[in-house]
Amino acid sequence: MGIASGIRSEFALRNHRRGRQWLCFLLLGASLGTSPGTPAHAQTCQTAADMDISVRTALETAAKRYFEMSARGDVATLKQNSIAPVASSFAGIEAAVKENQAAFTGAKTTVRPPFLLTVDGPEPLARAEFLCGVFGKSGQTKDSAVFVLPNLPPSKYSVTILDVNGGQDARTLTFVLQQAGVDWKLAGFFSKSSQVAGHDALWFTERARDFKAKARNHNAWLYYREAIALSAPVDFMSTLATDQLYDEAQAAQPSDLPTNGSTLDVSASGKIYHLTEIFPLAVGGDLDLVVKYQAADVSNAARSFQENTAVIKALVTKFPEFREAFAGVVARAVEPSGRDYGSLMAMKDIK
C-alpha cells in the first residue's frame, strides 16, 4: 500500500489524520532513484480537452459505475473491478465505502473533466510528477493541476473526480483508475467532505487572513492548513488555489511550531516535554487542536492523563491565542513504538 505525497509535501497539504483515504499501487521493496545508468522515464498528462472523446467517455462511465457500486455498498463488485494489488489488500477501501455509503445514498453526482496520466519506462517510477493543462509564467493557471504519485508502474492512469451533492453533506469522491486492456480498473478511492466542523475552505481562508492581520500567526498558519486541505480533493493534487494559499501561509508561518521533523520543547511541572506535532482536528462540530509529544511509556493511564493535562496547560500558556481559535486541545503521548494515549480538555476548562 502506498500513500500519495502532496505536491508541496513539506507543508502537508492534507492532514492525513482527519478522515481516511486509501490509494494502493504495486510497490517495489526499495525506493528507485535516477542515476546515469538508469533508463529514462516519461510522464505525461492529458486534460479532458486533450484526450480522445472515447477515452473521456470511458473514464466518466467507469467513475459513475464505481460510484453507484459504492452507494449500494457493493464492495464485492468493486473488488472484482480493482487492480490486483488493490484487490489483495481491500480492507481499507471496503471500510471507506461503508463509512461513506450513507452520504452517497440518494446523492447526485457531477463528474469533473478527468485527467489522463501516462508513465512510460521499463520499471516503476519512484516519484511521478504530472503537469496538467496550461501553465503561465508564474506557474499554475485556473485550469491547470499538478499530481505527484509514488511508485507508479508503467501504465495509463486517470484521476477522475466526482462532486457528490444531496446526501448528508457535499463532498468529493476521487477515483484513481488504471487501464487494463479495454477496462479501467479501480486503483484508488478517496472520499472527502467539503467542510470541516461545518465550515468550508473559504471560511477558513478568511479566518486565517483575519488572524494574520491581528498578528495571530500561529492561528493563521493552522487555519491556512485547513483551507489548503479543503481546497483540493486529494493530497497529491495541487492547483492554482492551493498554490496561492500556500504562498499566503508561508508568509504567516511561525518559527516556533514543530514542522518537518522538528520539535518544540515546553516545560510543565518541572519536566521538559518534546512536542512533535500540532494540527487542527474536527471532533463532531468542534475544531480542536491536537498536540503530540514524545513519551517513554504510556501503560500507566493515570500518569499519562496527568502528563497530558500538564502539556495542554503549558501549550495554551505559551500560545494563549489558541483560546480564540479552538474549542479544546487533545494531547497524545506517543511511545517510540507508536502506541499512544490521548485525552481531550475543553478550552473553557484550561486554567
Predicted features along the sequence, with ranges:
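Short beta-strand edge/turn micro-motifs at domain boundaries
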Residues: 43, 152, 156-199, 280-303, ...
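Bacterial N-terminal signal peptides
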Residues: 22-35
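Short solvent-exposed beta->alpha transition segments
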Residues: 46-54, 60-61, 76-143, 228-258
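Acidic, serine/threonine- and glycine-rich low-complexity intrinsically disordered segments
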Residues: 193-273
